[in-house]
């Protein structure tokens, strides 16, 4: 029996690869967030992907956490810190003193992580940046 090869355009290949990448990212982020949500005593919030150019993550007033897809390329300890940072926003929707005290309870060296996170974009391949 003859098999005809599947022919895809570059655009179709890109869509297929990006859909796969997005599924991997959601799985990865949920797996990383779950233990920290449990530690904080909050339910695991919905996580969605972002293509933000200047933010690694954000937390909406409804508790949804948006994470930049490029986080897949930075060091795991920075991703873990960012999960703590965003999950703390489900309790304090600002960067008040109380918010930072909560972050510090779970990540005592958060200031060093903040600095490292600001430099982490250098670890992201060009093709994965804000596309």
Q: Across the structure, where does each feature detected by a protein language model lie?
A:
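Active-site-proximal or metal-binding-adjacent scaffold patches in catalytic folds
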Residues: 1-81, 90-131
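Walker B catalytic acidic pair
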Residues: 86
């Amino acid at each position: 029996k003859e098999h005809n090869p599947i022919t895809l355009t570059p655009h179709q290949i890109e869509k297929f690869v990006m859909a796969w990448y997005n599924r991997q990212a959601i799985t990865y982020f949920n797996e990383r967030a779950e233990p920290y949500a449990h530690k904080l005593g909050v339910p695991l919030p919905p996580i969605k992907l972002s293509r933000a150019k200047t933010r690694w993550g954000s937390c909406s007033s409804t508790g949804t956490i948006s994470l930049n897809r490029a986080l897949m390329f930075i060091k795991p300890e920075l991703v873990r810190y960012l999960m703590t940072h965003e999950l703390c926003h489900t309790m304090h929707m600002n960067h008040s003193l109380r918010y930072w005290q909560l972050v510090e309870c779970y990540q005592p060296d958060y200031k060093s992580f903040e600095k490292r996170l600001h430099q982490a974009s250098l670890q992201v391949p060009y093709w994965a940046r804000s596309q």
